[in-house]
Amino acid sequence: MAETLQKRHEQIMRKFDRAHSPQEAVREKCLEATRFARVPGGQWEGATAAGSELGKHFEKYPKFEINKISTELNRIISEYRHNRITVKFRPGDKTASEALANKLNGLFRADYEETDGGEACDNAFDDGSTGGFGCFRLTTNLVNALDPMDERQRICLEPIYDPARSVWFDPDAKKYDKSDAEWAFCMYSLSAEKYKAEYNKDPATLMSGIERSWDYDWYDVDVVYIAKYYEVKKESVDVVSFQNPLTSETVTYDSDQLELVEDELADIGFIEAARRTIKRRRVYVSVVDGEGFLEKAQRIPGEHIPLIPVYGKRWFIDDIERVEGHIAKAMDAQRLYNLQVSMLADSATQDTGSIPIVGKSQIKTLEKYWANRNKNRPAFLPLNEIVDKQGNIIAPPTPVGYTQPQPLNQAMAALLQQTGADIQEVTGSSQAMQPMPSNIAKETVNHLMHRSDMSSFIYLDNMAKSLKRAGEVWLSMAREVYGSDRQVRIVNADGTDDIALMSVVINDNQTGQVVAMNDLSSGRYDVTVDVGPSYTARRDATVSVLTNLLAGMLPQDPMRQVLQGIILDNMEGEGLDEFKEYNRKQLLTQGVVKPRNTEEEQMVAQMIQQAQQPNAELVAAQGVLMQGQAEVQKAKNEELAIQVKAFQAQTEARVAEAKMVQILASADSAKRAEIREALKMLHQFQKEQGDASRADAELILKATDTQHKQNRDAAKNHSI
């Protein structure tokens, strides 16, 4: 076993040499550029692109630094911090949830804010834009490390300092985000004392009795180098899909997850639909030094190496990855500018008079007075007389001659101006940042600002690629870290926060335990980035635009009140909280804005329910109206009854007439006249009865119509 670990360690050391050797010169240039821009005196270090070391050639000159490259570099960094790049998740297929995507957005913002996300990204962007290479990492920490029963974790974003010396990727990885890397190193150094205290090992043993097959020296006098070694392994995993025949819902689990949920899935109607063996990416991390393993390999959440590179400019030339920051091409011009300023300053500080020419005997023992004349500025300078061997004065102490003062080099001044222009041209120094006259057209100003933005676009675009990769790595880790049913804090885009659940749960019937069915396990979520002004800047711009729009609206415009509410909702100020809360309730009531949390959803539902319930006066008015309608219907029914009775009476009369006709036909002639007279009287009586019935029906209908009109007028008065 020991021999196997030793061979494994040797393989890891050789991998490090493979990553370090071709990149060593490139990373040294990154460090040199960073020191050149940030460390005092760094602009006199190193050599030019052609290999000349100016510091050695001009040791006796004063060395001034007029840092003309930092202004543009600071502008690029400030532009990034003003226009933050945000990560967004969105559903990638039909099984993904829009609501869960919004929760992921809020949870990522919460992890970014509560950990070192801001510092990690800012530090990586600074390193990338200055030296050419930056990096940050994602890791997991316990939510409550003091509670041994609390196993909850959260994803953290951590900065990596001095990444040009510490982060090394698989040289076979060619993609910008290193998503194709199979392994990587993240180094850090410890003092000998801390190394001994933390790992209970004597650093001296690292150099004794080791037959090394690698080149890098992991121990240097008082410093011990150790590294986290990340490696991606592709392991065979059985993936099982279950489907509900009734709902056609499908869920997928790895084979090692089935023990927890298999019986519950069967109880709720899921049956196994398909099974497949796939290669699953899993990441392992171990800690190594120059002798062996300090910590054995352990699996970490996610499927990707959690190291996120950030580049300034990047190329592959001669199969070597080459990077540089914004100032790399301006370093020679800056060195020349500093040299010219130093030479002019040296010339200006020298004695402008002629230098006396004297013999050695005239200056003997008096050198210090003459050497320090520009520094001490004495009232007079001593000089020895010329004497013979007997000590007699031959000549007075008079200089033999004088040197001619060197005139100011006009070409030097012109060259100094040209060098400054060269620095501005190479760095793309923004003229838009200089004061402008007030009479310049708005289109011209926008054109200058756009041209200025182009010089920093490549750095912001590369940072967007890096943050997109960070979102992919975070999502891969979140599927495991936030897989249990627990409340998590999410942060909305406007900075407000809420509590949300990332999963649903079912009960294990055998153990009684609650088993989480993670919503994140189903569906694909795409990661995008949004490059633009911060939420505060966009909100202020919205207020400005809407205020101008409001000024052009008529007072009676129905949209004016809505516009005023939106402006107030986007405003910030002291003492506006209660007023804004009232205003938002009004906007929610009108349906102008959507609820953004559970409390507002409940409030909107309550308002809708109240709107559906009529008030007492309306109910009373509706009751009167219904009563009137009932009376009208009653009158119609009575009219129909009268008509039916009249029809029945007429029918009976016709039957009686028919019977009379039959009797008349069978009677003799003497009685026929009497029968006819009786029929005539009967017909007259039926007619009078029918007329009386119709008159009674009309009176009833008129009375009913009058009562209905009175009830309707009463209902209108109630509603008013």
Swiss-Prot record:
Organism of derivation: Acyrthosiphon pisum secondary endosymbiont phage 1 (Bacteriophage APSE-1)
InterPro entries recorded: P22_portal (IPR032427)
Record's protein name: Portal protein
One GO cellular component, as annotated: viral capsid
Record family assignment: Belongs to the p22likevirus portal protein family.
Organism ancestry: Viruses, Duplodnaviria, Heunggongvirae, Uroviricota, Caudoviricetes
Quaternary structure, from the entry: Homododecamer.
Keyword line: Capsid protein, Late protein, Viral capsid assembly, Viral genome ejection through host cell envelope, Viral genome packaging, Viral penetration into host cytoplasm, Viral release from host cell, Viral short tail ejection system, Virion, Virus entry into host cell
Domain of life of the organism encoding this protein: Viruses
Primary subcellular site in the record, as a coarse category: virion
GO biological process: symbiont genome ejection through host cell envelope, short tail mechanism
Pfam families (UniProt xref): P22_portal
